[in-house]
Amino acid sequence: LHEVVHSSRDARRKQTLPKLSSAERDTLIKKFHPDHREAAYRPVAFGPNEGELTVRELASVLEGDSPIVEDLPLDPDYIVDVLVIGGGGAGCVAALHAHTEGAKVLLATKLRLADSNSVMAQGGMQIAVAPNDSPVQHFLDTLKGGHMKNDHDLLKTMVEEGPSIAKWLIELGVLFDRDPGGNLHVKKGGGSTKERLLTCSDYTGLEIMRVLKDEVLNQKIQLLEFAAAVELLSDERGACAGAVLRDLDNKRYVVVAAKAVILATGGIGRLHIQGFPTSNHYGATGDGLALAYRIGARLTQMDTFQYHPSGGAYPEQLAGQLVTEGIRSEGGHLVNVNGQRFVNELDTRDVVASSIIRE
C-alpha cells in the first residue's frame, strides 16, 4: 500500500477535484452519512421531545432517572448571579463576560478547568478577517454547508461577532499565526470559498484555552472543579434557579442558587454514537442535554450530528485520534486502496465523511 500511495503521488499533485453539486451532495449524504441510518434512531419515550427521533445512545441518556433523592435538602451552599456549568472554551468565555458586566459568577466543571474538547482542537477557527473576505461571504458559505437548515439569527451573530472575538482573544494574549508582514495568517478550511482559518500552529485550541484559563484564574472567578452538575433546580414559576452539583472528591452534594444558569457542557462524542470512535475528551457525555431536558427544555436538531472525516483507524490504540482538517488544508490527500483521490478534501465535512464511508 505504501508503494501504491508513493507511486501515485506526483500524478495526484496535478489533480484538481471539483466539489460536488448540490444534487450530488444530497444523493451521497443520504446514502452514506450516519445521520441517515434509520436503524440507529428511535423515538424519545417521553418529555418535551416525545416521539421525535434521535440516536439510541442519546435517547437513553435523556430518559435516564435523576440521580438525587426527592428529599435532598436544598438549602444553598452558594448564592450567585450567574452559574456557568462547563469549563471549556464556551464556559470560560461566558464566565469572563458575565464577570466583566459585574455579575457574581460561579464556574463549575466536572473535571478540571479547561478539560474539554476546546483544548484538543487543532485545525483552527473560521473568522472573516482577511481583506478579501467578509461576514456576508462567511454567512453564505456556512448556510450552504448547512444545507440551508441553519438558524439564521444564530449564524448572523456568529459571523458578525467573529472578528471582534478574534480581536478580544488577541488582546488577552492568544498568539495566532502571522505572515511575514505581521498580519494574521489565514488558511483554507473545508466548505469555505475564502481563506479564513485562524490558527496557532497545530495546537489552536490549546493556545486559546491556555489564555482563557489564565484569565479566569487572574480575574479570581469562583471555581469548583470536579463538581459535576446532576440536576437543575426550578422556582415556583418553573424557571431555572440553580443546580445541584456532585462533589466528586468527597461524594457530597452542593446546592447552588443562581439568577441565571449557563449550560456550556459540550457535546456527546463519548457516547460513541453508532459505535464510532471519537476524539472527544472523556467528559463529553451529553450531561447538559439531559439536565436541560429534565427541567423541561425542548431540544432542537436531535437528528443531526457531526462526524469528523479524518481520524486514526490503525493501529488499534490510535483509533479515534484526531487527524486535523489542517492537514488537508495544507494539501494532504485522501486516497483509496488504489492510491486514487476520491473527494475534494476541502469539501464540507458531511461530504468528506460520507465519501470515506463509501470507499
Spans of model-derived segments:
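Extreme N-terminal leader/targeting segments of oxidoreductases
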Residues: 1-81
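An anion/pyrophosphate-binding glycine-rich loop and adjacent beta-alpha core
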Residues: 1-7, 291, 297-359
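Conserved redox-cofactor binding core of oxidoreductases
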Residues: 36, 45-54, 171-252, 257, ...
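N-terminal Rossmann-like FAD-binding beta1-loop-alpha1 element of flavoenzymes
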Residues: 81-107
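Short hydrophobic core segments
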Residues: 83-85, 255-266, 292
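Glycine-rich FAD pyrophosphate-binding loop
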Residues: 99-125, 131
